Structure formats: C-alpha cells, structure tokens
C-alpha cells in the first residue's frame, strides 16, 4: 500500500520541518523589535570587514547567513526614507509599505564564501558600491523603539 501524500505522518512531519526551517531563516531574535534587528543587520557594521561584522549577526541567528548588505548611513537617515511615498515592495508586491531611498548611499555587500558549522569559521567576501535602496517600514513599537520615530524601517527589500 502506498501512503496518501497529505495524510502520511512522515510527509506531515517533513512539511512542518521544512516550514520551521524556512521560518527560522527569516526570524528576528526575540529580544529585539523589527527596527532594532534592522539596525543590527543593515546599519551597525561593527567592523570594516564582512567576516568580523557578520559574526555579530550570525551569533544571534546561530548560523552563517549567506549574504547581507550594510548601508553606510545612519538609522535616522533610513527612518527619513520611510517618509517617502509608499510603493509595492519588489520582493512581495502584495505589501505596499516600501519606500525608495531617492538618493544613492555607499554600502557593503557581504557574501558567504566559506560556510562552516562553527560560526566563527565562516568567511565572507565584500563588495562596495553606491546604490539606491528600498526599505519596508512599519509603525514602531511604542514601548521599545525610540519615541522620536513613529514609523521605522523593518526590512531591506532591495538595493538597486
């Protein structure tokens, strides 16, 4: 007998496992708001070298992220972009909370070249450029985000 695809316990466990893995790849650490996590991932490049800067992000996520872009600008400047006209997000056009930077900024793109199960052994190459960017913005967390920013960036949707 062949098990039914969608009622098989093995298939169900596999599906749930895959969904859990996919969800965890995009999850933020629980101690941060989405705006705080955005700042850690895309603004606060703690080192001029990707391998060192990515260690901070990877330690929170407990894995080596494949790629990441750091905008060499301030959080306040990105918050200002949230005031630009809203547009559909290129990565998900059903969302209309994205905003185009309007000006190019210097950025560093980090690309994983040496993956490892040990986070400290992951190595990255970096590419610098000046590009426009598109961010998704949402209302801030009234308790944990800075009160001067009612709307904050929560996702770097695209660099162009």
Curated annotation (Swiss-Prot):
It is an enzyme of class 4 (lyase). The keyword Ribonucleoprotein does not apply. One of its GO terms (biological process) is chemotaxis. It is found in: Lysosome; Cytoplasmic granule. Its EC number is 4.6.1.18. One of its GO terms (cellular component) is lysosome. The active site is at residues 42, 155. It catalyses: an [RNA] containing cytidine + H2O = an [RNA]-3'-cytidine-3'-phosphate + a 5'-hydroxy-ribonucleotide-3'-[RNA]; an [RNA] containing uridine + H2O = an [RNA]-3'-uridine-3'-phosphate + a 5'-hydroxy-ribonucleotide-3'-[RNA]. Residues 1-27 form the signal peptide. Keywords: Disulfide bond, Endonuclease, Glycoprotein, Hydrolase, Lyase, Lysosome, Nitration, Nuclease, Signal. Substrate binds at residues 65-69. Disulfide bonds join 50-110, 64-122, 82-137, 89-98. PANTHER family: NON-SECRETORY RIBONUCLEASE (PTHR11437:SF62), RIBONUCLEASE (PTHR11437). Belongs to the pancreatic ribonuclease family. This is a non-secretory ribonuclease. It is a pyrimidine specific nuclease with a slight preference for U. Cytotoxin and helminthotoxin. Possesses a wide variety of biological activities. This is Non-secretory ribonuclease. The lineage of its organism: Eukaryota, Metazoa, Chordata, Craniata, Vertebrata.
